[in-house]
């Protein structure tokens, strides 16, 4: 037993490899014959009719005055341009028919490439992507059948998770400490609370202070010392000097 398991989808179609058709590809005799046949048929059956039709339409537009003619060469430049456009349009319109002829060739690498490309385009979207994804996943999973590394992994002991300790006395994992919820600070509770003063108390206090100030103004015994001391009479000479008698 080689340790590999081969899983394959039953009745799976293996897509044929697309032949490489590069610039250095040399066509076969049948392919050359089909090339010449396509060239002749596209010229006589498509290019010539379209070129003639384009020239007739262009000449009619010029004669009706819809298209202006050249002052020196007349309608010749526009007719040549219409002929060239009709020629290439005929060649391009015959490409599909020429491809069908190559697909009918049995021993033709070019025909095989065209058939493979058509099969890929006609398949449902994601078909080849899903198949390649399935193959890659199967090949990646098939290596675990008899791998010794897988056996060693299974023999390793399984450790149960350590329960988290809810107290400081029990053993706890390294680096993990219990979170102790602290209560409110007692100093904050002991701080005196500010007494709320009502409006009535504040009003009475202001009234008392007003009455005290009013009595001080009316009572002469409470007047200031400098108001109660009588002023001495002094004499003043003509020079403004004063003296006491």
Swiss-Prot record:
Residues 190-210, 224-238 have a biased composition (Basic and acidic residues). The modification Phosphoserine is found at residues 108, 116, 123, 191. InterPro entries: OCAD1/2, OCIA_dom. GO terms for biological process: endocytosis; hematopoietic stem cell homeostasis; positive regulation of receptor signaling pathway via JAK-STAT; regulation of stem cell differentiation. Isoform 1 is highly expressed in many tissues, including testis, brain, placenta, ovary, prostate and mammary gland. Isoform 2 expression is restricted to the central nervous system including brain, cerebellum and spinal cord. GO terms for cellular component: endosome; Golgi apparatus; lysosome; membrane; mitochondrion. Residues 1-112 form the OCIA domain. Keywords: Endosome, Phosphoprotein. It is found in: Endosome. Its main location: other. Residues 111-141, 169-245 are annotated as: Disordered. The OCIA domain is necessary and sufficient for endosomal localization. Interacts with OCIAD2. Interacts with STAT3. 'Asrij' stands for 'blood' in Sanskrit as this protein is strongly expressed in blood vessels. Maintains stem cell potency. Increases STAT3 phosphorylation and controls ERK phosphorylation. May act as a scaffold, increasing STAT3 recruitment onto endosomes. Involved in integrin-mediated cancer cell adhesion and colony formation in ovarian cancer. Belongs to the OCIAD1 family. PANTHER family: OCIA DOMAIN-CONTAINING PROTEIN 1, OVARIAN CARCINOMA IMMUNOREACTIVE ANTIGEN. This is OCIA domain-containing protein 1. It comes from Homo sapiens (Human).
